Each structure stands twice: as C-alpha cells, then as structure tokens.
Amino acid sequence: MLMMVIRIYIHKRLNAKDYNNFYTSIGDFGYTIPGSDAPQYNIESDSEHYLNFGIAHINFNNGTNNQITNPNPEVYTRFYIQMKTPDGQDRIVYEAENANAISFLIRSTYHKPMSGLVGGFRFDPLLGIRVYKDSFVLADELARIQSEFTTVYGNSGINVTENTTNYSVRMYWESAVVVEPGEPSPENPIPWLSNLPNITDGNPENIDGQWGNVTGFNYNPTTKLFNADVIYDGNSYPIRDAVVASNDDSFLTRTEKAYYFTQGGQKFLYLNFSKDIDSFMFKNHYSELKNWVGHALWNLSTGEVNVMEQLKVFQYLKFTEDNELMAYFYIVDTPVDDLISVTSNVAYRYWKPTWFGLGPKEPGPIQNKIITAAQGEFNSIRPTWVKPVYLGSYFAGASGLVIAGSALIKGGSPWFGLGLAGVGILAGGILQYADDNEWLNYDIAQVQKLEPNVNIRSEISEAYFNAYGQMFPSTLGQSLYRISYGQFDQSDLQVISDKSDVITVVFETDGITHTYQKDQIDDTWDGPATEIPLGVDGILPEWALWLITIVIGLFALSNLQKIFDTIKKKPIISIIVVIAILYALTYFNLL
C-alpha cells in the first residue's frame, strides 16, 4: 500500500508589505497557516517554500511567543523545520512527532552602524551594513521535544541581502506515508530489510544531506524484537520484528533519537543517547557539537552493533635512543579498522644536568607541544650519536693544533699534531654537514599498525592492568598502533601525563569515519616516558660535590702563584684544559 505524502507549509506573516513576497494584517501576527482570505505565497518565486528572514525584520528584542497549530493531528503526524546550509543543502534543525501544536519563542537582535527605526521595523533607510541574529526556542505542547537554533546573517543597503541560504528556513506539517514491504518469501526472507531505501545524500560523510528519520520506536526486551518506521523523501518504510542479535540490548533502551542511512551498500540505524540537537556526532558539524553522550551504530545488513560512548584511549609511551617519542596506541573496547590521525598536546619537561653530569639533575619548566600523527606521513629522525662524534672530532682537531704549536715552540716536528688536526676537523666538518642536511636521518611512519607480539604484550600489560583492572586483550588484530610523536632536541625528557591530552582521534570502522574531540576522549598516558628519567640523582650526592668544590677552591687559592706560573710556562696545556671544559659544557647542554 502506497499513500501520497501531504505537506502543509507555514509561511511567515508580516504586518507590512514584504517586498512583494506576501503580506497580511497585523491581527495575523507571528506564524500561521495561510487561509483562503490571506494573500497566497508566491510559489513561482520560491517553489521550495523557504522563508527569507532578512528581507523584512521585525523588532523582537524582548522575545515573542508564537504557536503553530496542527490542522489535523490524525493526518499530520510530524512537524519539521529545515534550514538552508551554506552549500545549499536542506538541513532539519527541529522535528517533532504526534504533536497538536508547536510553541516557540523567537528573539531577534539587530546591529547596525547607524541609528533609527522606521515604523517599528528594523529597516535602515540609509545604506549601511547590519547584522541580524534570530534565536528560536521550540517545544511541542507537552514540552517533550525541545530544541534551540540560531540564524545569523548580514544585510547591506536597502533590500539587498547577503548569504540568503544561511538563514532561509521552512516549516511544515507532514502526513504519514507507508510503503509496505510485502510478505516473506524464499527469495526475500526479510522483506522489510530489502524494502528500506538506499539513501545517497544523508550519511556520516555528508551530514547536511537528507537522512532517514526513525519514528515509532518500539523495542520489546522480552522478545528482543524491534519495530520502527523510517521516514525518507515523503515515504514511510516499516521495520518489522527486527531481531537484536547483541547480548547487550541496553543501547536500545538508552536511545533517545534515531536516524537511518546507507553506506557501502549496507543499511544502518544511528541511535543517539540524547535527543538534544547539538548532541549528534554524525549530524552536527564539530563546531556545533556540544553535548555528545554516546551513540550506537546498528548495521541492519549484518546485525552487528557498535556502541560508542566516551572514547577510551590507552597510550604506552617511551623515548627511543634517538629521543623519538613513540607510543603504543590502543583504543579500548572499540573496534578500529584504520587509524587515520591522532592529535595530542604533549606536556613535557627536560631534566638538566648539573656539576658536569656528576650531580643530580634538575627539572626544567613544563613545556607543551601540539603534535599530529597522520597515516601516510613520516617523521625524519636524526641519529643522536652524530653530534657527540663531530664535536669530539672538532675537539681532537683543536687538540692537534695545540700539539703542533707546542712542537714548533720546542723546535720539534709539528706533523703529528697537524695530521691529527686535519683528520679531526675534516671528519667533524663532514659529519656536521651531513647532519645539517639530514643525510643520516631515517624515516619513521607516524601511524603504523602492529601485530601485538609477546614482547609488546609483556611490556605494556602491567600498565594496562593498572589503568583498567583487566589484562591486555589477547586478540587485537590491527587495533594496536605505533604512534611517532617525533623527535625531541634533548635527552632526559619526561612526559607529564596529567597535563597531556589527546585532542582529536580520527579512525574508520566498517567504512564509517569517526572523529572524537578532547571532551569525548578519556585518555591514559603511561610508560617509561612518563616517569622521571633514570640517573637523575647523579653519580655523587650534592653534599659530596660541594665538599669537593670547596677543597678544590681552597687548593687553588693556596696555589694561585703556581697556577699563574704554569699558565705562563705551559700555555698549550692551559689551552687544552679550556677546550676540554668548553667541550664538556657543550656535551652536557650547559652552553
């Protein structure tokens, strides 16, 4: 049985001529269904019944209450408000079922650089730029379905509007439409499933498109049978006695609002655990998403159910020998087919050596670095052995020059010293040039899938157990990833776990891309990189170093004359000592 869809559109009514669109008397203030005695809406100028709020604007600064009455509740069972998006798509911003009336409060604010009102209307008789903002608060007569949305738009000059599609809306009541699925047969054992429409526009990849609206939501926890209607493009498609295969059916009892979509040839129900309009992760732009509390995706084609609440992310971090911060990255209790990207705020500090590396290391200030690791991208890692080697070569070269100079002063041969200097300076120069041009660097994938072998499992199992009170899963497939957060300039680093955050996670499961933001992520940072580095206590305690310093100082004071005589008689040795001190300061990052 197929019934034709019937819609009744609600038109905007003003008490002054609205630039030849439509008008009525002041007694018809607000919104109402046009009657036979009222001027008809100009269908030819806007066949889609969208109402342009910016052409004539009424002063509603203090708000005005309006009510739209259902002309026939037995026929018109759904009420919709749609708004044009910037790309011209139709987007539902409010909907209600089985309502006799819809009440809403509208507040309008108006800003312009010039003053003056004309007849109580926000018309600017002079050319100027103005900005309008309309806020709608809507509810049905029982306050069962409440929502709020805002339109913002600009105007320049008389009767010249900008970005019309950003604030044009339409409102309508819609009648029920039924497309019967037929009876089961050997060729079509689940007729309601094959009867469901293939939607090409509204889905998680195109959130502003038209989704299927799920109404008549009915689940029996005893029989585990689910019934509902999918409303799409003026038709109603029944879901009849769908069997819930999951042992945990709480996702259905928690569902507040549902939508239908198709993707990759499969049919899905998107079951949201809140009915607030800004709580739908897949139907909101992320700048609009505020109150997400969780949802479930029910693949009607396969029966698989994927429940997603606050995303739990476990990271086991450590620094490699080349100061690369890497993490074993695992999303807990959530299937992941493909990790696309991770963006994190890494808080860290550097433990600075003292007393030429002999004393205890001191913690530096906490610094922050925003890092994104993306699939298909690589980090270039500079081997840390290169810098000490070319600094050592330069030291050897400088020492060779000192030896050659000393030999010349004494009348000996300088060739050994010159040879040592040449080799040292040449080797150091070549290594430094290669290092500066990253010739010795190697690439590490920023996101890399891992098979969790015994070594990895034994390494992270204790930290995982401490975080979640359970053993690390034995069958992870490709859900475990190695994340490279890049190379840091210094060693002896510590990641400050309680000040670090995973900001964004993007992954794909069953062909659907999921994006989680900071407030939706419960992240755990663990591993050796989050601990105080080894050896921070130093080789000697601080009191011993002070004692040694005092002894050396007293010895130097008592032998100042001998020291000055040595510098005069043997300047070469003094130069070597100075070079050694400078090298040590550089090596320990004290210069």
From Swiss-Prot:
| Sorted UniProt keywords | Membrane, Transmembrane, Transmembrane helix
Subcellular localization is given as: Membrane
- What are its GO cellular component terms? membrane
Stated membrane topology is:
Multi-pass membrane protein
Which domain of life does the protein's organism represent?
Viruses
Chain segments annotated as coiled-coil in the UniProt record: none
Stretches that traverse the bilayer? 389-409, 411-431, 538-558, 571-591
Q: What is its main location?
A: membrane
Name by which UniProt lists this protein:
Uncharacterized 66.6 kDa protein
Query: What is the scientific name of the source organism?
Result: Acholeplasma phage L2 (Bacteriophage L2)
